[in-house]
Regions:
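Short, charged recognition helix plus adjacent turn
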Residues: 65-88
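Helix-turn-helix DNA-binding elements, focusing on the entry/boundary residues of the two helices
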Residues: 10, 21, 32, 47-50
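DNA major-groove recognition helix of helix-turn-helix/homeodomain DNA-binding modules
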Residues: 48-63
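Flexible coil/turn residues that form the inter-helical turn or adjacent wing/linker of helix-turn-helix
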Residues: 6, 17, 46, 57
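The alpha-helix within a helix-turn-helix
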Residues: 14, 25, 54
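Residue-level detection of the helix-turn-helix DNA-binding "recognition helix"
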Residues: 15, 29, 40-42, 69
């Protein structure tokens, strides 16, 4: 599922940066458990939160996702808009 892939990718990138979940959370101006909750599938960041995470990690949003994740995301978005109608 998309959310699990997101959580795993975040943990992977954070560990590559060599920072704890707590320190990353606090650096982003969030509660101590913010990143931990995301990595353990208890929460998802807002779109703005996602952009802050990418900025903190020094990557672009597209670099966050691999091709398989992007396909899942596009599929999820397509399903959402088909179900809820397209808004202009």
């Amino acid at each position: 599922m998309y959310y699990e892939g997101f959580s795993k990718r975040l943990a992977e990138l954070r560990q590559e940066k060599g920072v704890s979940a707590r320190d990353m959370s606090l650096s982003l101006g969030q509660s101590e458990s913010y990143i931990n909750k995301i990595e353990n599938n208890y929460a998802m960041p807002s779109m703005q939160g996602f952009f802050y995470i990418c900025e903190y990690l020094g990557i672009t949003p597209s670099e966050f996702f691999n091709e398989e994740d992007l396909k899942d995301l596009y599929d999820d978005l397509y399903t959402y808009f088909e179900k809820n109608g397209k808004h202009h």
